[in-house]
């Protein structure tokens, strides 16, 4: 890739080139310049590179709009997966769960939990993981299909609109029921 970095390997199977402070711009199909903290470039050409941002509240609190625009452009390019982690995610890894000062939207409630349990039960194992733990999980897959379905489960959990459970279930595509 024309610069020094690291080679990361999991289970003697999943290999990545890991680069730090990577500029993403027009040459990468990104219309708004962005500098990622890390990018994992998979050796498996069927997978997309994973762009990682490490978000500290002190720096990012005043630029949420810019950060969101930059990341949305990267996502919409279709060439990358975007991932955000915090210092708490990394610092508390393998110790105890971070003590976040905000609501963890991965924790489903009432009707949302029922939908998640019924249609996304195999992904329930991910609900209590931090973003850093989830990043490590996605780095150990051959395709992103399971994580796409898991993401749909998370989206289902965000729904707050009053609707009957059966009406919502009817909206779920048959391909993932």
What annotation goes with each model-predicted range?
Residues 1-177:
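Nucleic-acid endo/exonuclease domains
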């Amino acid at each position: 890739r024309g610069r020094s970095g690291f080679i990361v390997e999991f289970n003697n199977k999943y290999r990545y080139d890991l680069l730090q402070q990577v500029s993403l711009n027009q040459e990468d199909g990104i219309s708004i310049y962005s500098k990622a903290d890390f990018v994992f470039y998979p050796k498996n050409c069927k997978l997309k590179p994973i762009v990682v941002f490490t978000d500290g509240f002190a720096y990012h609190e005043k630029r949420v709009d810019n950060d969101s625009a930059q990341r949305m452009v990267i996502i919409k390019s279709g060439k990358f997966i975007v991932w955000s982690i915090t210092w708490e995610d990394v610092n508390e890894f393998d110790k105890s769960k971070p003590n976040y000062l905000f609501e963890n939207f991965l924790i489903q409630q009432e009707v949302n939990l029922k939908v998640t349990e019924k249609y996304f039960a195999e992904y329930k194992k991910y609900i209590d993981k931090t973003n850093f733990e989830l990043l490590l999980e996605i780095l150990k897959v051959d395709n992103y299909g399971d994580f796409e379905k898991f993401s749909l489960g998370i989206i289902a959990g965000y729904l707050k609109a009053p609707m009957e459970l059966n009406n919502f279930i009817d909206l779920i595509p048959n391909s993932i029921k």
